Each structure stands twice: as C-alpha cells, then as structure tokens.
UniProtKB/Swiss-Prot annotation:
Record's subunit section: Component of the class C core vacuole/endosome tethering (CORVET) complex composed of at least Vps8, dor/Vps18, car/Vps33A and Vps16A; unlike in other species, Vps11 is not part of the Drosophila complex. Due to the reduced number of components the Drosophila CORVET complex is often referred to as the miniCORVET complex. Interacts with car/Vps33A. Interacts with ema. Component of the homotypic fusion and vacuole protein sorting (HOPS) complex, composed of Vps16A, car/Vps33A, dor/Vps18, Vps39, Vps11 and lt/Vps41.
Modified residues (Phosphoserine): S344
Entry similarity comment: Belongs to the VPS18 family.
Entry function: Core component of the class C core vacuole/endosome tethering (CORVET) and the homotypic fusion and vacuole protein sorting (HOPS) tethering complexes involved in endo-lysosomal vesicle trafficking and lysosome biogenesis. The CORVET complex facilitates docking and fusion of endosomal vesicles during endosome maturation, acts upstream of HOPS, but is not involved in autophagic flux. The CORVET complex may cooperate with the early endosomal tether Rbsn-5 to mediate endosomal fusion.
The organism of origin for this protein: Drosophila melanogaster
Subcellular locations according to the entry: Early endosome; Late endosome membrane; Lysosome membrane; Cytoplasmic vesicle, Autophagosome
Name of the protein this chain belongs to: Vacuolar protein sorting-associated protein 18 homolog
Keywords assigned by UniProt, alphabetized: Autophagy, Coiled coil, Cytoplasmic vesicle, Endosome, Lysosome, Membrane, Metal-binding, Phosphoprotein, Protein transport, Transport, Zinc, Zinc-finger
Disruption phenotype: Flies display impaired deposition of pigment granules. Member of the 'granule group' of eye color genes as mutants affect deposition in pigment granules of two types of pigments, the ommochromes and drosopterins. RNAi-mediated knockdown results in late endosome fragmentation and mislocalization of Vps8. RNAi-mediated knockdown causes impaired autophagosome clearance in fat body cells of starved or wandering 3rd instar (L3) larvae. Conditional RNAi-mediated knock-down in muscle cells disrupts transverse-tubule (T-tubule) and myofibril remodeling in internal oblique muscles during metamorphosis.
Keyword Phosphoprotein listed: yes
UniProt main location, coarse: other
Lineage: Eukaryota, Metazoa, Ecdysozoa, Arthropoda, Hexapoda
One GO BP annotation of this record: compound eye pigmentation
PROSITE patterns the UniProt entry points to: CHCR
Misc: The name 'deep orange' was given due to the eye color phenotype cuased by hypomorphic mutations in the dor gene.
Amino acid sequence: MDTSMPNQPKFLPRIEHNSSGATANSYVATASGNPFETDEEDEIFSRHKMVLRVPSNCTGDLMHLAVSRNWLVCLLGTPERTTLLRFFLPRAIPPGEAVLEKYLSGSGYKITRMFLDPTGHHIIIALVPKSATAGVSPDFLYIHCLESPQAQQLKVRRIEKFKDHEITAVAFNPYHGNESSTGPILLGTSRGLIFETELNPAADGHVQRKQLYDLGLGRPKYPITGLKLLRVPNSSRYIIVVTSPECIYTFQETLKAEERSLQAIFAGYVSGVQEPHCEERKTDLTFSQLRFFAPPNSKYPKQWAWLCGEGIRVGELSIEANSAATLIGNTLINLDFEKTMHLSYGERRLNTPKAFVLTEYHAVLLYADHVRAICLLNQEQVYQEAFDEARVGKPLSIERDELTGSIYVYTVKTVFNLRVTREERNVWRIYLDKGQYELATAHAAEDPEHLQLVLCQRADAAFADGSYQVAADYYAETDKSFEEVCLKFMVLPDKRPIINYVKKRLSRVTTKPMETDELDEDKMNIIKALVIWLIDLYLIQINMPDKDEEWRSSWQTEYDEFMMEAHVLSCTRQNRETVRQLIAEHADPRNMAQFAIAIGDYDEVVAQQLKAECYAEALQTLINQRNPELFYKYAPELITRLPKPTVDALMAQGSRLEVEKLVPTLIIMENREQREQTQRYLEFAIYKLNTTNDAIHNFLLHLYAEHEPKLLMKYLEIQGRDESLVHYDIYYAHKVCTDLDVKEARVFLECMLRKWISAVDLALTFDMKLAKETASRPSDSKIRRKLWLRIAYHDIKGTNDVKKALNLLKECDLLRIEDLLPFFADFEKIDNFKEAICDALRDYNQRIQELQREMAETTEQTDRVTAELQQLRQHSLTVESQDTCEICEMMLLVKPFFIFICGHKFHSDCLEKHVVPLLTKEQCRRLGTLKQQLEAEVQTQAQPQSGALSKQQAMELQRKRAALKTEIEDILAADCLFCGLLISTIDQPFVDDWEQVNVEWE
C-alpha cells in the first residue's frame, strides 16, 4: 500500500491529492461529487491549522476539546500530568491553566468527557475509574473560570454528590445561567438517569441533587448520549430532548414565569399522566450523537440532527407555543452502516463516523482518518479531506461554537479550524433540481444569473403542466426572447396568458431605468409597440362574437383599468392617431369615446355623441371635463334638446363659466320650456353669481317685460331706485317697457329718470294710488306740490266733488284750499267749503303763533350767549411761578405757553409737537401755510426799509400778523390736548390712508 496516502474508506470516492496546494493537507473539493462548484470558486469547506500559544511547561497529547463563545478549553495529557488550558481566541493572551493530576492519578480516575456551558465559564469533566480494580466510583469535576486584567483564575472542585454516576451528557441552562452560576442544569448518566443540579463557586459542599427521570429503568448500561434544554420563543414552554443509542425522547411542559426548577417538566411523566414522545431506531452502534444548529447569535435552534444506527436524521424545530410535536421532519442521511457489517473491525472503524456537527445546509462528519461534508438537501458529498495521522495525529472529535458558527476539528496533536465559505451558494440549484421553485427563487434572488435560470425552468415547467397563466407570470420576469415566448402563447385559444405576459413585460420596460437619450428613444418605441398590441388584443376579446355580456364586461373592465395606467396614457396621447385608427378598425364607438376622454379630447367625444344623437351622454361628458369653451360651443344645441338638465349642468359649473360668453349662445328660444330655463339661468347668474354685466341684466329684464311683468317689478325693486347702483340700462328698459306697454314698470323707470310729470300722468291712467305714491317721491316740495295739483285737477275737474278735494288736502300737506278752488265751477255759496276754509285759517293762525314763539326763544338764547361771552372776557386764571408744562415738566414761564380752562398748561412748542400728529391733512396744510405767511410778515417788518412805512401801514401789518397768530392758535389750541383731542381720537383707526401704506410697502 502506498504510504503517502492514508487508508481510504471503501464506500467513498477517492479524492485525489492536489500537489499544487498551499499546504500538505489541501484537497480539491470539486472532484468530490459537487457538480456546481467551479475551480475558480473558493471551496465551501477548507481546513486550516490553528496555532495555540500553549505554555512551554504544558506538554502532552490533546485529549478533549470544547468551545463556546470564543472560549476554547482543551485537556493536554501525559502519563505524569493532565493540564486544562482555556484560550480566548480573538486575542493572543496567555491561557488559563489548571493542573488536574491530583484529581486523577492519585485517585485512579480517567477523563471520559468534557462539557462547556454557553458562557464559556463553567466546565464539567466526567471521571470514571481507570479499571474495575481501581476501587473508585464515577465522579465529576466542576471548574469555574474567572478573568481579571492580569490573568485567568480556574477554580477546580470535585462534586461528591454524584458518586457512582458516570456523567455522559449535560444540558446547560442558557435562560437562567450566567458567568457566576450555571443555573438549574440537567445531567445524564450512563444508566439512563436524569438529574437536576446547580453549580457555582460559592456552593462548596452544598450542591443539590434531584433525580428527575429514569430512562434506563434499572438497566446497568443505558447511556444518555445527548441532552438539550430549549424554551420556545415568546413563551414559557420548555422542551427537553434526550437521546440514547437507539432512541430519541422529547419532554415538554409550560412552567410558571418565576419557576426556576426544571422538575415540573418531568412531573407529569413521572406520575404516569403522560408518556414522553419516543422514536426508536434499530442500531448496531454503541453510541449516538445529538446536534442542533442555530444561526450565530440566535437563542433558539433552527434545525436538529441525530446520528444513530440508521444514519443521520435531520429536521426542524417547532416554534409554535401550542404545538404537540417538537421535532419536525424526518429526513434521513443514509450512511450505509448495513454495508459495513461484513467488514473487519478496522475497516468498519474507518467507515463509521466518530462525531459530527451541523451547519445550516450540511452535516460535517469526522471519521477515523478523514472528514467529509454532506449536503442536507440532496445528500450529496461536497467535501472530503483526509488526515495524515503520522503528521497531524489521530483525529479525536469535531466541535462547533454556537455563538460564532466556527467549526473545530482536533487530533491528538493539532487543532484545525474548518472554515465555511458561502455554503448556501448552490442551494438554489439543489432546490431547482428537486422542483422546489419557491425555495430555489428565494435562494437565487441575490444572483441575477441564477435567478434567470430558476425563473426560466419554472416557467417551462408550468407551461408543460398546462398552467399557462402561471407560466406567463414567470416568463415575464425572465430575459427569454420575447418573440419565442409570444409564439408559445399565440397558438393557445385562451388569450389571457399572452395578454398578462405582454402587460408584465410592458411593466418591466416602464420601470427599467435608462441612461442615454438613445436608449430612451428605443424604450419609447418598445412601449409603443407593446401598448398598441395590448389594445388590439383587448379589443378583440371585448368584441368577440357569440360571447355573453358578462364576458364583455369583464374584459371591458380590465381594458379600462389598463388604459388608465400612467405610462399607457402617456403613450396613447403621444400616438393618439394610431390608437384612434386602431379602435376605429374594431368599430367600437364606446371605447372610441372612452379613449377620447382618456386623452382629454372631449371636443371630439361630444361631437361624436351629438352626431349619434346621444344627448344625455354628451351632456355628461361636458360635465366631466374641465374646459369651459366646450360649454360655450355645445350649450345652444343641448339646451334645445335637454333644456332643464343643460341648465342644471350650467348652474353646477357656477363661476367657472363666464356668463358673458355663455348667455349669447342661449338667445335662441324655440319654445316655452327653453325660455323658462334660460330665464332660470339668468336669475341664477344675477342672484347667485352676482354678475353686474349690463347685457345680462337687460336680457333678463326684456324676458320679464315680455313674459313676466310681475317678476319685472320685483326685479326693479330689488335693483333699487338709485340709478348709479342699478346694473341695467335705464333708457333701454324704459324703451322696452314702452314698446311692450308695461305701464307700472314704465312709471317706475320714469321716476328714476326724473320724468315726474309724465310718470304721474301715466299712473293716473290706470292706478290712482300709484300716481299719489309717485307724486310723493320727489324731494323738492315745489315739484311735489305741482304733481299733487295735477292729481287734484285730474280728480276734481269736472266732478266738483268737494269730498275728494277735502281728502286730497288731508293726504298732501302742501295743498291749500285756495289751491283747489280754481278746479271747481263758479259758485255763490261757500257752505260746502266753510269747514275747510275755517281749518285753513286756524292752521295759519297756529303757524303764526309758532313762528312768534320761535322768535322769542331765539332772542332769549342770543341774550344768554352774549352774557356768557361777557363773563368769559372777565374770566382769568392765575399762573404760579412754580407751575410746569404738562408735557416736558419744565418751568412754564420760561417760554410762551397756553393755559386751558380745565387747568392744563402747555408750552406752545410742546403743545404743537403733540397736536400736529392729531390734525387732519387739511388742518396740517393750513397750519403750514399760516406759519409761512407769519414768518414772511415778520421778515418784512424786520427789513431796513420797513422803518419808512407810514403809521397806517405799520398798523395794518400788525393787525394782519395778529390775525395770523390768532388763526394759528385757533388750530393748535382749539381744545385741550388731554381733555379733548386725545379723547376724541380714541376710536380713530391707526392708519387712515391704506392705499398710501400699500404703495410705500411695495
């Protein structure tokens, strides 16, 4: 046998040595049966030798190794000495060291197993007698690890409570354990017993021991090979998984939040209320191994695996709080143990794994002379590498750090780090080959090339199965030739798949970014072609003969939604003629109108609808659009067909329509209904929209005069009698009313035109009451008297009706009996007028007496005012020398001053300074003018030639100057500043001239 190559297992393919590798133990993984890796890719698994800084005084072979949270603990042994070393892998610091020889050699013990808790601070070492004659019973050591800036401290203690029990498995408690205490943990023994205990450095000699369950049922040899404590996320349900060589058990129970002990989990099973879930597998192995995989930094495992006599069983863990099953899945990786039954012990040893670890997609198995990795998904071997025992030593076991995911393989001489590089790289291909397309798509999502392969194969499979709609969806996501895919679907009678495929391709094009103008032009051409084709496909389905209304309605709805998409609208607007021609070829007037609406061509829509005599649809189209010009254009025709709905629509538009543009289109009125609706809109425009346009008012006035005289009078009254405020042409209105003989309105208008005589004369022809009201309207009493005389003449002349004359005297106080007498025929007796004449005389007498009384009161008031003025001339106020100005508070007598009757005193300049801002603009201008004139007079008198003035001229100048000063004082001192001016301005606005303020701000 070639000594350069270690023995190769019989049922595994030989892996050729790669002589060009960087190390002596480097092998090519691609030749091991992984068809997906290329030589250019990094290997999924690669072995690298680790260099541990072992102290020089520590020698011997590596016996056991455990790793957790980057803490690596190993045992080195020689016949004379056994040493425990504890390394912190991220930093090159001296390891912690503990010599265990005093616990071993002198007592006849040997170490069988070593367990490390998840924190890396608690170590359990199982001890058994070296031989049956050693005279000792199984035991275990507990080592607590502490760190300080200077060194690590490893405290070793023998746990006497567990004598006679060989510890074969430990379930640490990650939920209650910490660096200072393990919390409640479970210990499994070689006889199938499960104990609960809690270890910490402070409990010297006081370790509690509780037996929770017996799987061995008294058998002397029933080792527990695996023990794991789990808690379902977001719940208080605990799960315990236990394995023996041929069975795997699960226990579960919900604990109280404050409960620490794990005894309650087994209580129901001990009492017989329930049985543990057990799965038994036939085996010829004397051991089994339980492993879990959790992603780095995860608290709950994702997968489990059990190495047993059948092979490796793999599955997932349930995370449902109420799930009865815990271990889900029953995938078996067959290791062909049965084929090794006829082999020799040495050959069987080479083909039986010593240990394994679990990654997310692989199981990594350690054999006596090699390590290999098997994919969990397809059970293909993806990696194998042999050990040169002469060089690196005999392989012992393999471990995985649950925190970091790092894998460590160790022999008696060396520790290797088995690196895992992108182990998921080929998962997509495996799922694809198995037809699990959802999973294949998910794992290929990050690689566009792989994703395209998955989608293409998935689409082909769906098409082959007749799932054409599904196939269309996936083809649309691929880069497969558009023409090729379309040819596949065009032969199908159902056009739904090809329509959806083209729509999805259109969606991809419209969302795909373009970088250059040239590409933009190409993109627009592609979009145009796809949109036009889709429109054609839709119209074919909509207008398919021999199809029911439900079919057409369904396709029509989908077509309408498609046409309203933003990119479709944009494309059809740019190519409106092409689309219009296509729709015309399908002879589809409804969709032609819908298309015109979609692109905003409402003019064409309304024209087509009117042409087809679809007046209601045309009106609705007008209502739905926003262009007022179309109302002006089509309202005349619509109001002849649909008067009321058209006016309702016009009124609903409100101020959006210009009444001045609209009304001229409504002049043609062929029947009463049209006239009434036109009148209704004019009333709306005037009373609701408050239009002031003369033409609108004149139009409505003409309609009223011709058809509704009563409404005309109401309109005129609303407009009022102030000719400057009315919005109609008074002269036009007068002419219309004259032509149409609307007398009452004509009287109203003649009053506004101040044609009082003609108004009264006209009113006398049909309404005496109106004539009297008209005669009473002028403000000039002379005109009123004249008008009442005309009424009297009309009422009395020729009738000699004294009673009417007397009534007129009562109605108008401007008329006297002597004014009416000429209207009567000659008479000799005045008996009929006696009472009226006497009343007139009494009235004259009363008025004379009132005038005399008023004259007496006026004389009396004049005398009283004269007396008061005389008293004021003699009134005086005393000014003290210490009096001060009310404004500046300085001595009053130092400057000219004013003193008011209220007692307030002001310097003249102080008063002027505060009064001027309160004056009106006119007063300010007048004050400035007076001051300039006064200054000019003073300068004139001061000139040298003024000495030559005569005495009369000098007196004239002095008088003029005094008059100016008096007028200035009348402005400034007209009222006390405090008692008059400031009080009178309290309700005045701060700003008088807002227009000026706005100009200044601009």
